[in-house]
Amino acid sequence: MKKYFFTLCLLSVVSTLFAQETRTENNGNLILEDIPAIPGSIKEDLSKFQNVRSAAFRGFNNQDEGLFISTRFGNVSQLHLVKSAGAARNQITYFQEPIGSVTMHPTKSSIAFTMDKGGTENAQIYLLNPESSSTQMLTDGTSRNGGPLWSNAGNHIAFQSTKRNGSSNDVWMMPLDNPQKSELILESPDGTWWGAADWSEDDSKVLIQNYISIANSKAYIVDLTTKEKSLILGEKDSSSVNSALAFDENDKGIFFITNQYGEFNQLAYYEIETSEVTVISKEISWDVDGFSISDDSKKAAFVVNENGYS
C-alpha cells in the first residue's frame, strides 16, 4: 500500500512539472526562458532615477532678480527663469527643437539664441523677449549661423555665418534695428573655424578667434572701420595654442590661453602696443581651461584642470 501511494505521489509530481508552462521572452537581443517577470513596481522605482533632469546656467537676468537656466522639460531642453534660490522655474521657450547657444543683452532683457530644425545643423539666430516669450528670427533661415556676441552698446551682434557661399565660416556684424543689413567683417580664407571672441570697449574693434586644430589656433583684431585684420596671437607658419579670451579694461591688451611658454595651457596677457606677453599662471603646473571676466573688465576668474579636477 505504501509503495502504491509513493508511486501515485511521484506520478503526480512528474505530471505537475510537465504541466507547467515554459515562459519564453524575446527582447530582440536575448531569448529568456523561465526568468521571472520584472514586477511593475521595480520599473516605476527605476524611472525616478532614469528621468532625472540636469540644468545648465545660461546667464543672469539683467532686468530683474534671478537667472536663466536650460533644462529638459518634455523631449528637448528649453530656457527657464529661476527668480531665487529654491524658487520654481518659469519656462520661457516652448519650441519643438532644443535651443543652442544663449547670450544676454548687456543692458536690456533681450536674449539672442541659436536653434536649428530637424537636426540639420543650419542653426539660426533668434531674438527673444523673455517677458512675452515672443521671438524674431534675425538670420536668413537657410545658412548655418552661430556664436552670437552682443556689442557693448547692445545695438549690434557679431556672429559666424556661411551665408556668403554656403560653406565658409565668415564673421558678420548685424545691426539690431535692421538685421537684413548684416555686414561682412571677416571673410574666411579657408575651411577652418572663425568666430568673434570679444568687442573692444568702444565697439570699434572685434577680437577674432581662428581655430585650426587642437594644437593650432590663432587670434586677430579686426578694425570695423577699415575691415583690416591683424594677427596678434600665434605665428602664421607655426602651430601653437592661442585661445583669445577678452580685451582688458582699456583695450590695451588681450587675455588669452596659450602653450607657447611651457608644457601647459597657461593664462597670459598680450600688450598690444609693445607685443609683450606676460604669463599670469606661470606658477601653476596645470592646464587653464576656463576664464570669465566681469562686465567692467576689472576682475576675472579662471579655472584650472588640476589632475583631472577643475
Segments from the language model and where they lie:
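Sec-dependent N-terminal signal peptides
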Residues: 4-13
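Boundary at the C-terminal end of the N-terminal hydrophobic targeting segment
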Residues: 17-19
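A short helix->beta-strand "capping" segment at the edge of beta-propeller domains
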Residues: 31-55, 86-89
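Conserved beta-propeller blade repeats
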Residues: 51-70, 89, 96-114, 125, ...
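Beta-strand-rich binding/interaction modules
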Residues: 80, 217-222, 266-270, 310
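Short loop/turn segments that connect beta-strands within beta-propeller blades
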Residues: 83-87, 129-133, 175-179, 223-227, ...
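Short, intrinsically disordered, charge-balanced linker/junction segments flanking boundaries
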Residues: 303-310
